[in-house]
């Protein structure tokens, strides 16, 4: 079954126009170690005839050197690009692959299954619309399978295909497939994943991957590729106009425009808009793009907006429709995936980056961390590498945002270490919190005094030192 178009040879321009208009689906493959994630991607590409001859020749040669399938072609090597990955037979980094069929364009994120690479998996899942959860038919649900399911739910992925892999090793048993299906549905009952589909496959042999397999006549569903091509994705989490200002454009004294990319919704000339967090109101005078003047701008377009009124608009501000305002607060509750080997501690200052807006912030309170093996809430005072927690975050100034469930782009932020400039964590906004009305006592102390106080309370709790931030 080939997805190559005859137009490539006869009319390349028409092919490119059709290709540009195809819907794009981003999906991630995840699961436990050695569940066959990379092999599945290799099989999808191979059976769809989307591998070049030189790539195939290279894989044949590498299969003999470092392959894990004996004399057979090791399709996982198509994705495992790092030398250390090939030598160990595992995935370490997030590997991205791009391909298309007659119906859709695809971006695949192949993520590592090992627990120590959970941060890599979270990074890969953050922009995906669908997840393929692989489960080894011999082993059933593993600890890391549960971990990945929880992260997919946390990151707002609404569509999941559960691929029960290595069915060839269990004699294509319907009973084993059904027991894994029942076990997964019990797990999914506590997660917010509305669309779940199941398919039994053998990535190694190609059963039910691109074409329906005669070896499992009891399975009445469709092969995996059919689901990928036809599953309906709701790309618009919200229709509300959100335009974060990236740059103020002043080429001369006669022109002042505000540049950025429309995150969601649409706006047209003459619309009344509000600038957040200031709340000032104005009207759109013109919309400019690389292609010239526009009457209307939609999500995904990079544009320049001019307004009728000379009001203060700066980088990091958010332009919205007058009555479709977002939250503005300096206090919020969020879920955090910690990605640094240095633990997250209370009251330590970090850079908090929301799209084009960067402020200083610190954890005001740990609500709890989630044991993602049991999904139970556990009390904590710090957060270690790969752990996930719900926290209360205090920012140095009010910031404009939506909840992550409403808008995955506006409701996401990253935490940056101020000393090393390394991304230390990723956050998803749950809701804003009311700012404390009482006087902020931290203004009475220097940053050094506050950090020293935090260290003393951490390492010498028997001194009963007062918390200067309260």
UniProtKB/Swiss-Prot annotation:
Gene3D superfamilies according to UniProt:
P-loop containing nucleotide triphosphate hydrolases, Translation factors
Q: Which InterPro entries match?
A: CysN_GTP-bd, CysN_II, CysN_NoDQ_III, EFTu-like_2, G_TR_CS, GTP-eEF1A_C, P-loop_NTPase, Small_GTP-bd
Q: What is its EC number?
A: 2.7.7.4
The chain positions of domain tr-type G read 22-238
Listed under GO biological process in this entry are:
hydrogen sulfide biosynthetic process; sulfate assimilation
The record lists GTP as bound by 31-38, 110-114, 165-168
Pfam families (UniProt xref) = GTP-eEF1A_C, GTP_EFTU, GTP_EFTU_D2
- Family annotation (PROSITE patterns): G_TR_1, G_TR_2
Alphabetized SUPFAM superfamilies for the sequence: EF-Tu/eEF-1alpha/eIF2-gamma C-terminal domain, P-loop containing nucleoside triphosphate hydrolases, Translation proteins
What does the record give as the reaction this protein catalyses? sulfate + ATP + H(+) = adenosine 5'-phosphosulfate + diphosphate
According to the UniProt record, where is the region G2? 89-93
Which stretches does the entry tag as region G1?
31-38
Q: What keywords were assigned to this record?
A: ATP-binding, GTP-binding, Nucleotide-binding, Nucleotidyltransferase, Transferase
- Pathway where it operates: Sulfur metabolism; hydrogen sulfide biosynthesis; sulfite from sulfate: step 1/3
**Superkingdom of the source?**
Bacteria
Which EC main class describes this enzyme? transferase
Q: Which residue intervals make up region (G3)? A: 110-113
Region span, G5: 202-204
Chain intervals for the UniProt region annotation (G4): 165-168
**GO MF annotations in UniProt:** ATP binding; GTP binding; GTPase activity; guanosine tetraphosphate binding; sulfate adenylyltransferase (ATP) activity
Q: Which family does it belong to?
A: Belongs to the TRAFAC class translation factor GTPase superfamily. Classic translation factor GTPase family. CysN/NodQ subfamily.
Q: Tell me, what does this protein do in biology?
A: With CysD forms the ATP sulfurylase (ATPS) that catalyzes the adenylation of sulfate producing adenosine 5'-phosphosulfate (APS) and diphosphate, the first enzymatic step in sulfur assimilation pathway. APS synthesis involves the formation of a high-energy phosphoric-sulfuric acid anhydride bond driven by GTP hydrolysis by CysN coupled to ATP hydrolysis by CysD.
> Partners and quaternary state?
Heterodimer composed of CysD, the smaller subunit, and CysN.
Name of the protein in question: Sulfate adenylyltransferase subunit 1
What organism is this sequence from?
A: Francisella tularensis subsp. tularensis (strain SCHU S4 / Schu 4)
